[in-house]
Amino acid sequence: CALPRAGRGVEEGVAAWLQADMPVTDSYLSRLRCIGAEVRKVDFKRDVKGALRHINKWVEERTRGLVKGLIPEDYPVGWEPHAVLVSTLFFNGSWWPERFVRVGKAEFGGVGPVEYMSLSLGSCSDPSLRGRVSDDVVVVELLFRDTDVAMYIVMPADFRRYVETLTYEKLLDAVSTLPDEVVSVKMPLFKAEFKQSIKPLLMDMGVTDAFSPEKADFSQMVDVKKYGGLYIDDVFHGAFIKADENGVVAGAATGVVVKPICAKTGGRHVVIDKPFIFVLADRSTKTIYFIGHVVDPR
C-alpha cells in the first residue's frame, strides 16, 4: 500500500495497543503495518491503569514532552477499553532565511502589552517572503530551514466573523494566493496548549455511528462472531505549540479509545498585533499539520 506521509521535517508516530486475547483480523493488522504503526498486545482486563500509563508515556516520548497525560488518569469510568489507537506529530523548525529578534513589549489586540519579535529582510541578497495585505485580511508565509513546512499567519480585520465563517476551502485559498512581497514582519512570541476530549466536536461534525454501540461496525478490525462488536468510547486530543525568535516547536497527539459493545456505555511591512490564526502546513500539498488561533499570546 502507499499512503501519504508527513512532509520533510515532521516526525509522525502511529501505534495500536490491542487487547491480548482479541481476535484481530489479518486485514486490519496488514493495514496497521501499511501505515507503519507499532502494534502492542496488552491486557487491559488485568491492568488497565498500567496500560494507559504506558500509552501516555509513549505519547510523551514521541512528542518530546510536549503532550503529557493524553488520556486522563481518571479514565476509564466503568468498563476497560480493548483497543487504543494513537497518532502523534512533532515539529521543531528554525526560521529561514533569518532569525527573528526580540524587540520588546507592545500592545496586542486590546489584551495589553506582550513580547514582540521582528524579522527584517532589508538586504538585496535576502529572499523576500510571500504575503497578502488587504483591508480584510493580512496573510504572511514564514519559512523554516531544511523542511517542507511553512507557518501561515492569517490576521483578519474582523476576527470573530472570519472564524465563524471559516472553512477548509476558504483557508486554503487564503494561504495559496499570496501576491505581495513582504520585507518585514513583526509579531508576538506565543505559546498555545490544548488537551481534552474531542468526542463532542466529532459528533457535532456528523461522526456519530462509530460512537454508538448500536450502529458501530468494526467487523473489519475484529472477528465479531467470536468476540462481539466494538465501538469508540472517546477520542482525546492534545496539542502544544511555541513560537519564539529561534523558530517553532510543536507536538500533537490523538488517542482513540475502543471498547467492546458488551460493556456499558512593494515590499509590504506586516505587523501582527491583533488576534490571528496560525497554520503549519506542507508548502506543496498544503497538508495541514497544526492549526489554531491566538487571542492572547501570553
Named regions from a protein language model:
Residues 99-101, 154-156, 163-171, 255-256, ...:
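Composition- and surface-driven signal marking solvent-exposed, interaction-prone regions
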Residues 1-159, 176-264:
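Non-catalytic, conformational "gating/processing" segments within enzyme and secreted inhibitor domains
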Residues 239, 245-298:
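C-terminal soluble interaction/assembly domains
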